[in-house]
Every structure is written in structure tokens, then in C-alpha cells.
Amino acid sequence: VHAFRRRYRLSARESQITELILRGSGNREIAQALGITVMTTKKHLGRIFDKVGVDSRSQLMAKLG
């Protein structure tokens, strides 16, 4: 995940969210784990998708490969 973070210039929070996605966490679980709202989680996910150039979690997971 660290090389992925550097390659796509993800923030520390975006990297945390990416790690939780890899573990299979949903938006509610991510929000609870990080002490943020579900809406904030969705905003971070949108930024991650934009930076990586994907439209879905499955595409993100495929890029993380």
C-alpha cells in the first residue's frame, strides 16, 4: 500500500481508507474505525477513485492487485 500511496499521491487518510477497503470494510465500518462520518468516508473514496482513475471498489482492488 505504501508504494501505491506514493504512486498515486494519496494522503495519509486516503491510504488508511484504502487499507480498510482491502480488508473488506464497508463505508460504515471505515467511518467507525477512523472516527469520521459516512459522508466524509464517501468524499475520501471519491478522491481516491479520481486519483487512481477508477470508478469502483472492485476496480481499485484490481489496481492494488
Residue ranges and their predicted role:
Residues 4-5, 20, 49:
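Hydrophobic alpha-helix position signal
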Residues 14-21, 60:
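Short alpha-helical "packing" element that flanks the helix-turn-helix/winged-helix DNA-binding module
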Residues 6, 14-16, 33:
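A generic structural signal for short
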Residues 1-12, 28:
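Linker/hinge segments immediately adjacent to helix-turn-helix/homeobox DNA-binding domains
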Residues 24-59:
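Recognition helix of helix-turn-helix DNA-binding domains
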Residues 21-25, 64:
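Short helix-to-turn junction characteristic of helix-turn-helix DNA-binding domains
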